[in-house]
Curated annotation (Swiss-Prot):
PROSITE patterns: ABC_TRANSPORTER_1, ABC_TRANSPORTER_2, SSUB. Part of the ABC transporter complex SsuABC involved in aliphatic sulfonates import. Responsible for energy coupling to the transport system. Signal peptide: none annotated. The lineage of its organism: Bacteria, Pseudomonadati, Pseudomonadota, Gammaproteobacteria, Pseudomonadales. This is Aliphatic sulfonates import ATP-binding protein SsuB 3. It is a peripheral membrane protein. It is found in: Cell inner membrane.
Length: 270
């Protein structure tokens, strides 16, 4: 297996995405409506919106965990399905197997001589020295670092993040944001982050997309230099622009986004 550090630049470059006339319905309920979106290779995009607006459904469609009712998902000019080996998804829960050591969780499903690659991935997230420990010995933030290493070992060109930091305390969350931003800058993959935290979105993303009732309500470019100064008036102004748009809509208790697990996901249902 080739080292992450030895990868040719063209393999580390992110996947360009195109979403065309995307619709997703569950029965009579239309969750996504005519989504059109172009994401250049290597862009860091944050997707925000009220609970139940359709943002996690969009990520599941991009991950191949569900199929659109109508529309196209493209990686460049090819179907996104052709890029599944280059795509990895992280959830809010790390989903580590407690009966496997940390290094074995990182190399889960791989064959051949993968241990050196697993150690390198753990080194990238700052946990190489914990490789032979059990997941139970880790904090919540450390478990998410292992989940991130498990994605990195596959050398993704598209990284999909479904609120992976939502359960972390404030300081650990900022540390994870900085780590994800560092790895994105280092490896050049395309990132889509679903988050409820607007301040998080404007702090680390190139672009913030607001989903409103299944449609794109706002597409905001975050044209600020990195590293960004948290608490700056420029970040605060961008955050206020997004929040003002969200709060301008009448609030109503949303229905949860429908979820139909694939057979391979049923083991996580409990």
């Amino acid at each position: 297996m080739t080292s992450l550090k030895q990868q040719p630049p063209h393999l580390l470059r992110g996947i360009p995405l195109a979403v065309r006339n995307l619709k997703k319905a569950f029965g009579t309920r239309e969750v996504l409506k005519d989504i059109d979106l172009h994401i250049p290779a290597g862009q860091f995009v944050a997707i925000v919106g009220r609970s139940g607006c359709g943002k996690s459904t969009l990520l599941r469609l991009l991950a191949g965990l569900d199929k659109p009712t109508e529309g196209q998902l493209l990686a460049g000019s090819a179907p996104l399905d052709d890029a599944r080996e280059d795509t990895r998804l992280m959830f809010q829960e790390a989903r580590l197997l407690p009966w496997k050591k940390i290094i074995d969780n990182v190399g889960l499903g791989l064959s051949g001589d993968w241990r050196a690659q697993a150690l390198e991935a753990l080194e990238a997230v700052g946990l190489a020295e914990r490789a032979n420990e059990w997941p139970a010995a880790l904090s919540g933030g450390q478990k998410q670092r292992v989940a991130l290493a498990r994605a990195l070992i596959h050398k993704p060109r598209l990284l999909l993040l479904d609120e992976p930091l939502g359960a972390l305390d404030a300081l650990t969350r900022i540390e994870m944001q900085q780590l994800i931003e560092k790895l994105w800058h280092q490896y050049g993959f395309t990132v889509l982050l679903v988050t409820h935290d607007v301040s998080e979105a404007v702090a680390i993303a190139d672009r913030v997309i607001l989903i409103e009732e299944g449609q794109i309500g706002l597409d905001l470019l975050v044209d600020l230099p990195r590293p960004r100064v948290r608490g700056s008036h420029r970040l605060a102004a961008l955050e206020a622009e997004v929040l003002n748009r969200v709060l301008a809509l009448p609030g109503s208790p949303p229905d949860p986004e429908p979820f139909s697990p694939l057979p391979t996901q049923l083991r996580w249902a409990n």
